[in-house]
Amino acid sequence: MGIGACALARSPVKIKTFGLGSCVVITLYDRQERIGGLVHTMLPSISDARIKDKPFKYTDSGIEHLATEILREGSPRKRFEAKLVGGAHMFENRNLNIGERNIKYAKNTLEKFEIPIISEDTGKNYGRTITLDTSTGDLLIRTILRADKII
C-alpha cells in the first residue's frame, strides 16, 4: 500500500506499507471485532490543499475517513485503539519538518475524536516499513540497520 492510501480488513489479513519517512501511518483497531485499518498520510491538513480530492493524503482527513469506514463495519468508536508510526525528520531544512507537523496533526485529530493512542514509534531520522496484523492489532516495524519492533 502506498502513500495517500487507506486499507481496512478483518482478521486474518495483514496490511503492509513501505517507504514511511516524514509520512505518518495511523492505525485504528477494534480488538473485539478484530477489524483494523491504516492510512498512510503525507501532509498534515487537507485545509492546506488547493484540490481536496485525495483525503487519505492528509493526516486529519485520512484519520476521519478511516474512522468512518470502521464505523460503517459496525465497530463503535469507543472500542477504537490508535497507533502512530513515522513522522521522521528526513530533510536538513529545520523549517520544513513535515514529519513533526504530521505527528502533531495526528495526535490532535485522534484527541478530537476521543480515540486513545495506545502506542507509537515516531520521529527520529530513519524510514520504516509497517505491517498491521488484523488478528492481533500488532504493528511490525522494520527499519534498516535496526532490529524489528512490534508495537
Swiss-Prot record:
InterPro entries: CheD-like_sf, Chemorcpt_Glu_NH3ase_CheD, Cytotoxic_necrot_fac-like_cat. GO terms for molecular function: protein-glutamine glutaminase activity. It is an enzyme of class 3 (hydrolase). It catalyses: L-glutaminyl-[protein] + H2O = L-glutamyl-[protein] + NH4(+). Its EC number is 3.5.1.44. Keywords: Chemotaxis, Hydrolase. GO terms for biological process: chemotaxis. It comes from the Archaea. Probably deamidates glutamine residues to glutamate on methyl-accepting chemotaxis receptors (MCPs), playing an important role in chemotaxis. Belongs to the CheD family. This is Probable chemoreceptor glutamine deamidase CheD. It comes from Methanosarcina barkeri (strain Fusaro / DSM 804). The gene is cheD.
